[in-house]
Design a protein with these regions (language model features):
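A short, well-structured edge-of-sheet supersecondary motif
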Residues: 46-71, 307
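Residue-level preference for non-acidic, small/hydrophobic
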Residues: 65, 84-91, 154, 200, ...
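Conserved serine DD-peptidase/penicillin-binding transpeptidase domain
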Residues: 26-45, 94-377, 491-494, 498
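Bacterial N-terminal signal peptides
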Residues: 11-21
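Bacterial N-terminal signal peptides that target proteins for export
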Residues: 2-13
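Short beta-strand scaffold segments in enzyme catalytic cores
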Residues: 57-60, 103-105, 452
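Small-residue-rich helix-loop
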Residues: 68-70, 345-500
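Short active-site loop at a secondary-structure junction
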Residues: 70-90, 94-95
């Protein structure tokens, strides 16, 4: 066992011990009788018109075998983005916080006089953070190696992840199944949360339109990043009178032509600079157009095309390295980034089974959950690792045991610091509950809402808190119900008041 791992384990144990020591003098909060519900939580459910059987929940002190309160804790529920806790903890546990993705690059040919007589080959391995700045640096590195003109093609190797439409049924029957598209989940293909995983995922396959008012000219200037080759954008829109209300609707955007997005409306004079991220309408062509666009922006020339292909068997000319896994996990959980979670999910299959398929990723995650959580993992249904699914199922007890396990693990600091902090950042920035004292992952879909993480009590004790609502009115649970639950967990110095 490495000395670094031992130091990390000792450090994590010390942190946990300090938390425990700080709470040692405080009496344990009273436990709620089985089958009863704290009055504050019952009242919150009634206020938002949610039935009690829509909720599954656990509140449990860290390190304590007995929960302070449970409600239908073993009932399987759709967790929405709370599923990311399972994926990110498994990734940290199996790969380590310092693990990185590598993107090898080949100058496959001879270089002379600023010309590469051959192909530029880039092989993806699932890096979730090949954002515009890093793509720019990658191509700048190519130029630093003496290449200004590519007398050949830019070849993209995406083979690390298996094609999602090749199913066992299709192989057996030889019938064609529809290729999954970003519109499949909720018919909103331009929403960035619907972007699909890709072994060579560039800039989350998204565009960001920026609108900057210029009152002197009576227009708002429109710009777009990253630069896509061949993309034609309306350079400005007229300024309109009035306050900045639903500015997106007022723009009357038309994204039906991926090559020429249009804005037929106006932009309110009362609006400051605004950004509008969208998923690119033709994801299969996105990488090619981004690479062509940035290469041209750098002054480079390409005589051939950008196409898919295979990387050479020879060692690469250089390798681009991603940020550490801990940084990726932080972005994934703080901002509930679906495509980053799916990249992690398939990376687990690639690293643990040698092939980046969804089937193998489900196998890896299920095996890991069984090994770490035992019987609590029963009833677990895994789909894509992000929670953007109607099929995923797990229990509140599973998430509670997962968080207990994480608390005592060497990667506890990385996982906990990746969670949004109440009233401070991420998806909890607007939360009004226990400012700065709750680290909670949030989750929401149509008919689903949930929170799971850690809450610091008034006594100095820390609690695992899990709550999921599955109901057509689930959206009403945030913030009223979850704020009430978090506040109740934090108020552990008071006697529990039970609902009748």
């Amino acid at each position: 066992m490495s000395s670094n791992f031992i130091r990390r384990a000792v450090c994590s144990a010390c942190v946990a011990a300090l938390f425990a020591a700080g709470a040692a003098a405080a009496p344990a909060a009273p436990r709620v009788l089985p089958g009863t519900m704290p009055a504050d939580i019952a009242a919150a459910l009634e206020r938002v018109r949610l039935p009690r059987d829509a909720l599954v929940a656990v509140v449990q002190e860290v390190g304590d075998a007995s929960p302070r309160w449970t409600w239908r804790a073993d009932t399987p529920a759709n967790p929405a983005s709370l599923m990311k806790l399972l994926t990110t903890f498994a990734a940290l546990d199996l790969l380590g916080p310092a693990w990185t993705w590598t993107t090898p690059v080949w100058l496959h040919g001879s270089v002379a006089g600023g010309v590469l007589d051959g192909d530029l080959v880039i092989k993806g391995s699932g890096d979730p953070k090949l954002v515009m700045e890093r793509v720019w640096l990658l191509l700048r590195r190519v130029q630093q190696l003496g290449v200004r003109e590519i007398y050949g093609d830019i070849v993209l190797d995406r083979s690390a992840f298996s094609a999602p439409n090749l199913t066992q049924t299709q192989t057996q029957t030889q019938t064609q199944t529809p290729t999954p598209t970003p519109a499949d989940f909720d018919a909103e293909p331009l929403r960035p949360y619907n972007v699909r995983a890709d072994a060579l995922l560039l800039n989350y396959q998204s565009l960001v339109f920026t609108l900057l008012p210029d009152p002197a000219r009576g227009v708002a200037l429109v710009s777009v990043d990253p630069p896509l080759a061949g993309l034609r954008v309306t350079p400005s829109v007229p300024l309109g009178a009035g306050p900045c209300a639903d500015w997106r609707a007022a723009l009357k955007a038309d994204f039906s032509d991926p090559d020429a997005p249009k804005f037929a409306g106006t932009y309110a004079l009362g609006c400051a600079e605004k950004s509008w991220p969208i998923a690119y309408a033709e994801p299969k062509n996105y990488a090619a157009r981004v690479l062509s666009g940035i290469w041209q922006q750098l002054g480079g020339r390409l005589t051939g095309t950008v196409r898919d292909g295979s990387a050479p068997a020879t060692p690469p000319t250089f390798v681009a390295t991603s940020p550490a896994l801990a940084d990726v996990v932080r972005d994934t959980n703080k901002f509930s980034n679906n495509v980053m979670a799916q990249q992690l999910f398939l990376t687990l299959a690639l690293t643990q089974r040698g092939s980046g398929s969804a089937e193998l990723a489900r196998e890896v995650l299920a095996d890991w959950a069984q090994a770490r959580l035992g019987s609590a993992a029963s009833g677990l249904v895994i789909d894509n690792g992000s929670g953007l699914s109607r099929e995923t199922r797990l229990s509140a007890n599973l998430l509670a045991q997962l968080l207990q396990r994480a608390w005592s693990s060497p990667v506890m600091p990385e996982l906990m610091s990746s969670l949004p902090v109440s009233g401070v950042d991420g998806t909890l920035k607007r939360s009004r509950a226990t400012l700065g004292r709750a680290h909670l992952k949030t989750g929401s879909l149509r008919d689903v809402s949930g929170v799971a993480g850690y809450v610091l009590g008034d006594s100095g004790r820390r609690y695992v808190v899990v709550a999921i609502v599955n109901h057509p009115n689930a959206a009403a649970a945030r913030p009223a119900l979850f704020d009430a639950l978090v506040q109740w967990a934090a108020n552990d110095a008071e006697l529990a008041r039970l609902a009748p």
